[in-house]
């Protein structure tokens, strides 16, 4: 399975779904929730099922509507897709309740409320999820907090810490600066620096910036650096102007071990 750094939200409308076929994102999140009005829910579910039945797409996730979850997953049961994104996760009780519906699907828990953040350790430790994702827009709306990288730093660091502690991937909130690509790219770089495994996006033009920001963490690049370091007799390696020492190589080896373990499952 390909490494996922960039995840593009795609509303489940027919014309939007077709764009998945030419997208450069590592994964796609077909949205049946926030971007879809209540009147469109049934039509969009029909369109999503039709798309999945007629196209082979790797790394497609479905963001379900919690109120319609059982109906949606029942109808999607025979379709091929990698997993689901569960919105507004606030505790493990809901995940327990829906465990049967999640069977054989990768689950991304979207944490986007004050209650969810307050229970982040128990959510991160839940064995049935593969990843955590942060939804800043809902969180800041609920707390009347300004959405800025500086103000959200402690919350994001907490999410990353607990995700890593329990072996889960962690994906950062999407940037809404679709008219300021430079700023969005800077936010993606900040996400990578904080230790996130990737970042979500709401527009295709932000995907290149996300891919570039996380390029330093691509497996092949890491493997190349480790091999070069071990083939020399120096304590320091310089690649493309960047200095790597023993502690960097130890970290890269951990990443490679994790990647190999996941690939063999």
Language-model-detected regions and their locations in the chain:
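Expand to "…catalyze enediolate/carbanion chemistry for C-C bond making/breaking, isomerization
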Residues: 1-265
